[in-house]
Design a protein with these regions (language model features):
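The feature marks cytosolic C-terminal regulatory regions of anion transporters and related permeases
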Residues: 231, 359-523, 541-544
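Short acidic-hydrophobic, aromatic-tinged amphipathic segments that line or gate anion-handling sites
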Residues: 524-539
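Active-site-adjacent beta-strand anchor residues
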Residues: 75, 504-505, 530
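Short secondary-structure capping/turn micro-motifs that flank functional sites
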Residues: 328, 511-512, 531
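Transmembrane helical cores of multi-pass ion-transport proteins
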Residues: 1-423, 487, 519
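Intrinsically disordered or compositionally simple regulatory linkers and C-terminal tails
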Residues: 1-2, 537-547
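Residues that line or immediately flank small-molecule/substrate-binding pockets and catalytic motifs
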Residues: 135, 474, 531
Length: 547
């Protein structure tokens, strides 16, 4: 693994020169402009602080990039992760988040070491779309107070919204105007300009200037930005204990699962953009190490972010140094512009997050499944989205995957069975119509024969005509499991007890292996297997003549 990493690193920097260095520096600067407002916003929306989001972006941008599985990944705090963290902060405080981040990092590290990166391929796309949309809803719900300048109570977003019925909903007009200003700027900002100066950055600068000029003192601001990478609120290793671990098992798994999903999806997408290889397992190792280190500095969990990564690629990024430079520029901003960032209105950051939440949705994919009326895809999407909003990400993914598995089993259990008499006229090597063919039939089986299809298989076999000689054509049966093999064995035993002969033809290698292991081959004999039905019929005729 280390050898492969060093080899890929050597290839990445082969022919590196001043021109490529300048491209990495400029790409890093551009990504910094995108990452700065997002880091501040996601830090606040996670229930931590803007400084925590900034530290996360700086540390992750260096550590995860250097150890990562590709040259193009840019990691940091994300909207999806912040939506998960806000509930953990409400229940367990910042120390709970730091501990969960540390433990989730260890899980990601182990996942990379044991090469579990391919697990992401088992999550259906509608499920991923569903939890992404669910997270977008959670982000938007979590910013209602900051955007409208209201106050709510509750440990979850749903509880906070419900509290408005008791506390009342009294928007602060100044906060709403600042939030709307940012939203409008982000929407109307030209894409060609956004490639260099993102609309989110322009929006929060304008919002800060407007709030200062018009003395909008009633609006809450970001507050103090410490000029240090070692925040006062950080993981206290002395506080780690088994009881905390037991309480945080679900959040730990949630953070690790989200880190894996976001990072690997981002890597796969950017890999296609750059036409470069992506080592999923190495990326998980990098994400693990990064998330183990982050809470020691006071950072929150990080993942690879598609928004920042795509900006880097489009800005001419050459190597992973672009991510390092983005962190350097963020660090410079922290030390040089900390006093300015402290005055940023929370309503402005809420505006950024509202637009970000809207853009998070895979609108192309959503339109596709609804416009084509793909009922299974729509149900997978809706179930996962609602579960994400009502429960949490871990439950949502488990529900989505379990529901998808049930749909697959239901569809796969529709096994096809048909019966066909022998038409001697279609047999090229047979003249006339031998009497034995009148009591011979071919049974065609199509579809995988596994536990979900056994009942239908048995029901159809009970309708088999009274053949004396049965030939099973299994060319359309690609797979079989133990339950299916047991059903075939019992059927063959029953037919033989009735004095009937049984032959099989057109078996896939995997099906033949199961027949060998489950005793079907011993029961029927090796001479009962043929390449096609005609060969089986000719063998039957030969045996008839010999008698």
């Amino acid at each position: 693994m280390i050898k492969n990493y060093l080899t890929s690193l050597k290839q990445e920097f082969s022919g590196y020169n001043t021109a490529k260095l300048m491209k990495d520096i400029m790409a890093g600067l551009t990504v910094c402009a995108v990452a700065l407002p997002l880091a501040l916003a996601f830090g606040v929306s996670s229930g931590a602080t803007a400084a925590a989001g900034l530290v996360t972006a700086i540390i992750a941008g260096v550590v995860i990039a250097v150890l990562g599985g590709a040259s193009f990944q840019i990691s940091g705090p994300t909207g999806a992760m912040s939506a998960v963290l806000v509930g953990i902060v409400a229940s367990y405080g910042l120390q709970g988040v730091f501990f969960a981040c540390f433990a989730a990092g260890a899980l990601l590290l182990l996942a990379g070491i044991f090469k579990l990166g391919r697990l992401i391929s088992f999550i259906p796309m509608p499920v991923i779309m569903g939890f992404t949309s669910g997270i977008a809803i959670i982000i938007a719900m979590g910013q209602i107070d900051n955007f409208f300048g209201t106050a709510s109570e509750g440990s979850s977003n749903l509880a906070k919204i419900a509290s408005y019925t008791r506390l009342g909903f009294h928007p602060n007009l100044q906060a709403v105007l600042i939030g709307l200003l940012v939203v409008v700027v982000m929407i109307v900002w030209p894409k060609k300009w956004g490639a260099r100066v993102p609309g989110s950055l322009v929006g929060i600068i304008l919002a800060t200037v407007v709030s200062a000029l018009f003395r909008m003192d009633s609006i809450a601001t970001v507050g103090d930005i410490p000029r240090t990478l070692m925040l006062a609120d950080r993981l206290d290793l002395g506080s780690l204990n088994l009881d905390m671990l037991k309480n945080l098992i679900s959040p730990i798994v949630t953070i690790a699962a989200l880190g894996m999903i976001e990072s690997l999806l981002c890597g796969a997408s950017a890999s296609r953009m750059k036409n470069e290889p992506f080592n999923a397992d190495q990326e998980l190792i990098a994400q693990g190490v990064g998330n183990i280190l982050l809470p020691l500095f006071g950072g929150v969990p990080a993942t690879a972010a598609i928004a920042r990564t795509s900006v880097a690629v489009k800005s001419g990024q050459q190597t992973r140094l672009a991510s390092v430079f983005h962190s350097v520029f963020l660090l410079a901003s922290m030390f040089l512009l900390g006093s300015v960032m402290a005055r940023l209105p929370l309503a402005a950051l809420a505006g950024v997050l509202m637009v970000t939440a809207w853009r998070m949705n895979d609108w192309g994919g959503i339109r596709y499944i609804f416009s084509h009326k793909l009922k299974s895809g729509i149900s997978q999407f809706l179930i996962t989205m609602l579960a994400t909003v009502i429960f949490d990400l871990t439950v949502a993914i488990l529900l989505g995957v379990a529901y998808s598995a049930i749909l697959y089993i239901a569809k796969s259990s529709q096994i096809g069975v048909s019966f066909s008499d022998i038409d001697a006229n279609k047999l090229r090597t047979v003249e006339g119509k031998p009497p034995v063919l009148e009591t011979t039939g071919v049974v065609y089986v199509t579809g995988s024969l596994f536990f979900g299809a056994v009942d239908e298989f048995n029901r159809r076999m009970a309708e088999m005509p009274a053949y004396d000689h049965v030939i099973f054509s299994l060319r359309g049966m690609p797979n079989i499991d133990v339950s299916g093999a047991q059903a075939v064995l019992e059927l063959c035993e029953s037919l033989q007890k009735q004095g009937k002969t049984v032959a099989c033809c057109g078996m896939a290698d995997g099906v033949r292996t199961y027949f060998d292991r489950t005793g079907i081959t011993v029961l029927l004999g090796e001479n009962a297997y043929f390449w096609n039905a005609e060969d089986a019929i000719l063998d039957l005729l030969s045996a008839e003549i010999a008698e």
